[in-house]
């Protein structure tokens, strides 16, 4: 991507030598697809000849290009085959700044099973995972597709396998049923299964499916609606509350006070997707005001830059955020206008 240099800055050349032909093949990608994506991402021009990469641009742009190539070469050195997704993630992380190296973020293994590795894919996800390691209670708040629940469950399985905890407890509010499961037909399992199915699906990604029924029968893994947490003290457990935006303030307090010795809690949710009845305030909204600043409690905020689903999902999240902000601004203007007319009417009445 060629740009006009800023006034007073001359374009210069920077060269990077890649001594191993196989590394260069990986760096360029099949049909040069990686190279084309890199060129689109940079303000400097990039040309490759033999084992040499020539970067042409103003010094500041060249420095960005050098950093990008350095990270991509580090990924290759760590045994990775470059993909367009890895390049986009690296470009995004470099644009955000921060002290973390993208190559380190993208190669941080949480769990591996049958050749599939679960890793953070963004800076926000890496910081979220680090917070889970460092704090007893962590809130993961962000839009759909940011890996809030999936990464929390991966950390729970990792902790169980490392014998840091004795059991995993997964819960979510069955708000669609009003948590009045007794009014639904069928056994308890049949009643709660539709609401907890996403948690089972994630478990099947992380554990041998044949072992899951045995672990559940032994109480090592428990999946239950939030209402079933009341009155318990949960020791030596990794506890995850999913869809926490659909808890009331009272339910959130009840859940957090289940914490026992040797346990950790991760609470996940998206405050833009509240399904509670009108007028009911979300416990996930209020808990931040109540617990911010409390020792050993951390709030991790994920955003559209952390979405790891289809690239359109990130754009959709941003579009809805803009729409919500515009609607809120219009509502506020309407309130101010009504207040202004009311005040003027009051003054007119007093003059009469």
Q: Locations of the language-model features?
A:
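N-terminal intrinsically disordered, cationic/polar leader segments
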Residues: 2-3
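Short glycine-/aliphatic-rich beta-strand segments at the starts of folded cytosolic domains
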Residues: 7-26
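N-terminal assembly/transducer modules of large multi-domain enzymes
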Residues: 40-42, 49
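Interdomain "pre-motor" coupling segment immediately N-terminal to P-loop NTPase/helicase cores
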Residues: 47-105
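Conserved helicase motor core of SF1/SF2 NTP-dependent helicases
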Residues: 52, 114-125, 134-241, 245-352
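Conserved adenine-nucleotide phosphate-binding loops and their immediately adjacent elements
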Residues: 105-117
């Amino acid at each position: 991507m060629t740009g006009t240099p800023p006034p007073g800055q001359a374009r210069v050349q920077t060269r990077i030598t890649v001594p191993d032909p196989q590394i260069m093949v990986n760096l360029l990608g099949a049909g040069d697809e990686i190279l084309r994506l890199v060129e689109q991402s940079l303000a400097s021009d990039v040309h490759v000849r033999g084992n040499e990469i020539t970067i042409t641009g103003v010094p500041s742009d060249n420095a960005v290009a050098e950093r990008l190539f350095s990270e991509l070469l580090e990924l290759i050195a760590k045994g990775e085959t470059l993909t367009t997704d890895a390049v986009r993630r690296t470009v995004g992380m470099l644009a955000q700044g921060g002290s973390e190296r993208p190559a380190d973020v993208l190669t941080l293994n949480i769990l591996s099973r049958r050749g599939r590795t679960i890793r953070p894919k963004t800076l926000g996800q890496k910081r979220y995972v680090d917070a889970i390691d460092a704090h007893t209670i962590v809130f993961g708040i962000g839009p759909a597709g940011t890996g809030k629940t999936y990464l929390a469950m991966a950390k729970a399985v990792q902790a169980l396998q490392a014998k840091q905890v004795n059991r995993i407890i997964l819960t979510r509010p069955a708000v669609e049923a009003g948590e009045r499961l007794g009014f639904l037909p069928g056994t308890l399992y049949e009643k709660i299964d539709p609401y907890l199915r996403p948690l089972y699906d994630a478990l099947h990604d992380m554990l041998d499916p044949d072992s899951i029924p045995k672990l559940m029968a032994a109480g090592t893994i428990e999946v239950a609606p939030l209402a079933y947490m009341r009155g318990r003290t949960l020791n030596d457990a990794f506890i995850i509350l999913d869809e926490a935006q659909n808890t009331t303030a009272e339910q959130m307090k009840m859940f957090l006070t289940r914490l026992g010795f040797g346990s950790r809690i991760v609470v996940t949710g998206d405050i833009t997707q509240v399904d509670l009845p009108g007028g009911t305030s979300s416990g996930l909204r209020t808990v931040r005001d109540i617990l911010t600043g409390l020792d050993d409690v951390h709030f991790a905020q994920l955003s559209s830059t952390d979405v790891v689903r289809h690239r359109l999902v990130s754009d959709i999240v941003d579009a809805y955020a803009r729409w919500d902000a515009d609607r809120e601004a219009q509502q506020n203007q309407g309130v101010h206008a009504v207040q202004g007319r009311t005040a003027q009417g009051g003054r007119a009445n007093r003059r009469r």
